């Protein structure tokens, strides 16, 4: 109700720090009732920057997004949104894991949002703990808890494994431990390690683009445009293990994202221009 009352004097609304599953319903209702962009940053900002980083990491290790097997640990707002966006950009094999284990149809402990994702993921119907699910996977994405992944768990993943350990301030596994386990590319949410996965790469540009286009919504297609805009900033020649995502203070990012998002808004007809 508060957001609806203040909306007439703003060009867009950025939601922050709303836990799952409430965040899904609140954002859905606001998007239906307002004619300005509404964007829950903890969901979509995280999903966009993770997807951009994974596009480049997968390219660097010589694999393809449609072929990789991914485990996402943490089936809250960020984990579910990351999963949805990865499916949108063509990843075919994702398993979500929460405290009680892998999300799979029939598990009684899941909330409605998790039950929905269980129907769309986990093709092999894997049940069990994070350690069991990680076996043979190409990519680990963590938006969960500190220190829950070991070097041994990473060593059981596929060759040239990619590890995005984004629990803050202490990651699921420290970069040196992940490397010890055989990870080829490691990213965290911290600025004192290479490959920082930070929402600041997303929301300034995505809102600038939406406002420039006078967009009434931020659609899935606009989010995907932002993913590729961020990933494309790093050229094939620049791409390396410790540089798969632009830095948080790279001035090119917001402009590049804004242009891509505004262009897509006009193409989709959600622009008032």
Where are the model-predicted features located?
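Conserved active-site and cofactor/substrate-binding residues in soluble primary-metabolism enzymes
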Residues: 1, 21-25, 45-49, 73, ...
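Adenosine-phosphate binding glycine-rich loop
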Residues: 41-42, 61, 165-273
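General beta-strand structural signal in soluble alpha/beta enzymes
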Residues: 14-17, 38-41, 72, 96, ...
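Glycine/serine-rich phosphate-binding loop and adjoining beta1-alpha1 elements at the start
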Residues: 1-68
């Amino acid at each position: 109700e508060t957001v609806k009352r203040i909306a007439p004097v703003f060009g867009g609304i950025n939601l922050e720090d709303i836990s799952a599953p409430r965040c899904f319903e609140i954002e859905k209702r606001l998007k239906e009732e307002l004619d300005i962009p509404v964007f829950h940053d903890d969901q979509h900002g995280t999903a966009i920057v993770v997807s951009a980083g994974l596009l480049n990491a997968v390219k660097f290790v010589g694999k393809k997004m449609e072929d990789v097997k991914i485990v996402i640990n943490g089936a809250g707002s960020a984990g579910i949104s990351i999963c949805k966006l990865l499916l949108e950009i063509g990843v075919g094999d994702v398993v979500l894991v929460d405290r009680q284990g892998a999300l799979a149809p029939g598990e009684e402990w899941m909330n409605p949002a998790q039950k929905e994702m269980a129907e769309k993921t986990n093709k092999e119907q894997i049940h069990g703990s994070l350690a069991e699910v990680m076996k043979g996977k190409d990519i680990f994405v963590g938006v969960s808890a500190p220190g829950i992944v070991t070097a041994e768990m990473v060593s059981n993943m596929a060759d040239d494994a990619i590890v995005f350990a984004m629990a803050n301030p202490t990651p699921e596994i420290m970069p040196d431990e992940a490397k010890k386990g055989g990870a080829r590319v490691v990213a965290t949410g911290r600025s004192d390690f290479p490959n920082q996965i930070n929402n600041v790469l997303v929301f300034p540009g995505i809102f600038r683009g939406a406002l420039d286009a006078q967009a009434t919504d931020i659609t899935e297609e606009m989010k995907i445009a932002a993913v590729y805009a961020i990933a494309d900033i790093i050229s094939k020649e620049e791409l390396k293990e410790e540089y798969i995502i632009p830095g948080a203070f790279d001035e090119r990012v917001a402009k590049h994202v804004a242009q891509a998002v505004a262009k897509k808004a006009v193409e989709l007809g959600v622009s008032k221009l």
